[in-house]
Structure formats: C-alpha cells, structure tokens
Curated annotation (Swiss-Prot):
Classification via Pfam families: RBFA
Protein name: Ribosome-binding factor A
InterPro entries: KH_dom-like_a/b (IPR015946), RbfA (IPR000238), RbfA_dom_sf (IPR023799), Ribosome-bd_factorA_CS (IPR020053)
GO MF annotations in UniProt: ribosomal small subunit binding
Gene name of the record: rbfA
Entry keywords, A to Z: Cytoplasm, Ribosome biogenesis
PROSITE patterns: RBFA
Paired cysteines (S-S): none
Alphabetical list of PANTHER family matching this protein: RIBOSOME-BINDING FACTOR A, CHLOROPLASTIC-RELATED
Organism: Francisella tularensis subsp. novicida (strain U112)
Function: One of several proteins that assist in the late maturation steps of the functional core of the 30S ribosomal subunit. Associates with free 30S ribosomal subunits (but not with 30S subunits that are part of 70S ribosomes or polysomes). Required for efficient processing of 16S rRNA. May interact with the 5'-terminal helix region of 16S rRNA.
Location of the region described as Disordered in the Swiss-Prot/TrEMBL record: 123-143
Length: 143
C-alpha cells in the first residue's frame, strides 16, 4: 500500500515538473501549448505514460513528434529536479478523454433538444384534447 502512495506522489511530481518545463523552458509555441492531463507511472517507477491534450486538435500530431524529439530533454530535466534513483522512460500519449467527453456532451444536448421538442408536441396535443373535451362538455350541458 505504501508503494502505491509513493507511485502516486512521484507521478504527481512528474506532472508538475513537466508542466513547469512546458511553461518556462520550451520555446516551441505549439509544444508549449500542450497541457499534461495525467501521468501513469509503473510500480517500479521505470516507465511513465504522460497524457497530454492541446487546444487545436490539428496540432496533436506535430506535438506528438515534438514530444518524441524532446524526451531526452525532459528526462534530464526531471533527473535534475527530482531525486529519483531511476528516471522513468517517458511515453507521451495524446489524451482522447476530453474529446470523448465533448462528444458525449454534444450527444446529451441533442437528446435534450429532441426531448424538449417531444414534450412541446405532447403539451400541444394535451391542450387540444382539453379544448375538445371542454367543447364537448359545454355542448352536453346545453342539451
């Protein structure tokens, strides 16, 4: 259990260090615009999957290549910043969860709009039925 806590703490520190490096040391504007969303670290701390996202989806491929070229820089900077026996091998992965979440949000909005239209149609039908029933009731009373 203690090992899992350490893994989480080191992963959190890796995320902070890489985010700071992106903001302060990276001159490539597209790469610097990437946001680190999560770090998944192996139990032995030797491998790290760094999940990132970017505002412009069309830049994702460029950013992926830039991260690949910059792995050495990130590893050496991590070694200087954190006192780890082994600096993990880094694998940068585009995080699709935000895109997926946005697609789901869009589908939910479409479903809500469709439901709203159905409810409006049902309300109109009910009102017409009430009017018809009122007319019939009045006609019966007059007889």
């Amino acid at each position: 259990m203690a090992a899992e806590g350490r893994v989480q703490r080191v992963a959190s520190e890796l995320q902070k260090v890489i985010s700071l490096l992106l903001r302060t040391r990276i001159k490539d504007a597209k790469l610097a615009s990437a946001t680190i969303t999560e770090v998944d670290l192996s139990k032995d701390l030797s491998y790290a999957k760094i999940y990132y996202t970017c505002l412009a989806i069309e830049d994702a491929e460029y950013i992926d290549k830039a991260f690949e070229k910059s792995k050495g820089f990130f590893r050496s900077s991590i070694a200087k910043s954190l006192s780890l026996r082994i600096v993990p091998n880094l694998k940068f992965i585009y995080d699709t969860s935000l895109d997926y979440g946005m697609q789901m949000e869009e589908k939910i909005q479409q479903a809500l709009e469709a439901d709203s239209k159905i409810i409006k149609q049902d309300d109109k039908s009910l009102q017409e039925n009430y009017k018809q029933n009122d007319k019939e009731t009045k006609a019966e009373k007059l007889r």
